[in-house]
Swiss-Prot record:
It comes from Xanthomonas axonopodis pv. citri (strain 306). Keywords: Menaquinone biosynthesis, Methyltransferase, S-adenosyl-L-methionine, Transferase, Ubiquinone biosynthesis. Pathway: Quinol/quinone metabolism; menaquinone biosynthesis; menaquinol from 1,4-dihydroxy-2-naphthoate: step 2/2; Cofactor biosynthesis; ubiquinone biosynthesis. This is Ubiquinone/menaquinone biosynthesis C-methyltransferase UbiE. It is an enzyme of class 2 (transferase). S-adenosyl-L-methionine binds at residues 76, 97, 125-126, 142. CDD domains: AdoMet_MTases (cd02440). Methyltransferase required for the conversion of demethylmenaquinol (DMKH2) to menaquinol (MKH2) and the conversion of 2-polyprenyl-6-methoxy-1,4-benzoquinol (DDMQH2) to 2-polyprenyl-3-methyl-6-methoxy-1,4-benzoquinol (DMQH2).
Length: 253
């Protein structure tokens, strides 16, 4: 298990080294800035494919009617809506996010669609979840783990609140596997994406950070190992779209 950033005192914010205690605030400023344009951000970062990734992520999850699910870094609620379709009227989805602005957007969006029953909204830090042990049948986090300061602590907390027999799933931008595609992907990430962010959201810096944060996130095998160290069993991952994103899964047994 790697040393906690809070112990070493420093961590990364994109390609910058910053004090570990400051990263949460810096990340919060990014997501407060992009909250109202979050779906646009994902469209720009993924060329629109994120919607298919998310549908597959939920469709292949271990979940059944009546289950209680926690969706961390739940953002604008798109994953939560898909999960609610799986758990049905008897089940419940808790949408958790550390950023109040993102949580507000998600709540407003679902309420405006008439989706009220069976959803709860909790502002929470993935490193210290405010839930009892063994609270959830399934735990998901999509495009959020890379922004967490202490990922090991977050994975341990995910394991703690998961019921025995439950599954945790992580959908995250990862390491591209095709060498020929890497220069194209880098060009899009560092040359095109910030300009699109400036053009459509008047915010090039946030989009620059988001591109950099992907490169600092642990690659597939490393994250699989981190999940195992946190206690998860039967850990595995599946690359999507040539490793642009990966789905990691682990179980509490």
């Amino acid at each position: 298990m790697s040393e906690s950033p809070y112990t070493s005192g420093t961590t990364h914010f994109g390609f910058r080294d910053v004090a570990a205690k400051d990263k949460q605030k810096l990340v919060g400023e990014v997501f407060t800035s992009v909250a109202r344009n979050y779906d646009l951000m994902n469209d720009l970062m993924s060329l629109g494919v994120h919607r298919a990734w998310k549908r597959y992520f939920v469709a292949t999850a271990q979940v059944k009617p009546g289950d209680r699910v926690l969706d961390l870094a739940g953002g604008t609620g798109d994953i939560a809506v898909l999960l609610k379709e799986r758990v049905g009227n008897e089940g419940a989805v808790v949408l958790g996010d550390i950023n109040a602005g993102m949580l507000s957007v998600g709540r407003d969006r679902l309420t405006n669609r008439g989706l009220v029953s069976g959803f709860d909204y909790v502002q929470c830090n993935a490193e210290a979840l405010p839930f009892p042990d063994q609270s959830f049948d399934l735990l998901t986090i999509s495009f959020g783990l890379r922004n967490v300061t202490d990922k090991d602590a977050a994975l341990r907390e995910m394991y703690r609140v998961l019921k025995v027999g439950g599954q945790a799933r992580v959908l995250e931008f990862s390491e591209v596997t095709a060498d020929w595609f890497k220069p194209i992907y880098d060009f899009h990430s560092f040359k095109i994406l910030p300009r699109l962010g400036q053009l459509f959201a008047r915010d090039a810096d946030s989009y620059q950070y988001l591109a950099e944060s992907i490169r600092k996130h642990p690659p597939q095998e490393s994250l699989k190992g981190m999940m195992g160290e946190a206690g998860f069993a039967r850990c595995h991952f599946k690359n999507l779209t040539g490793g642009i994103v990966a789905i990691h899964s682990g179980y509490k047994i």
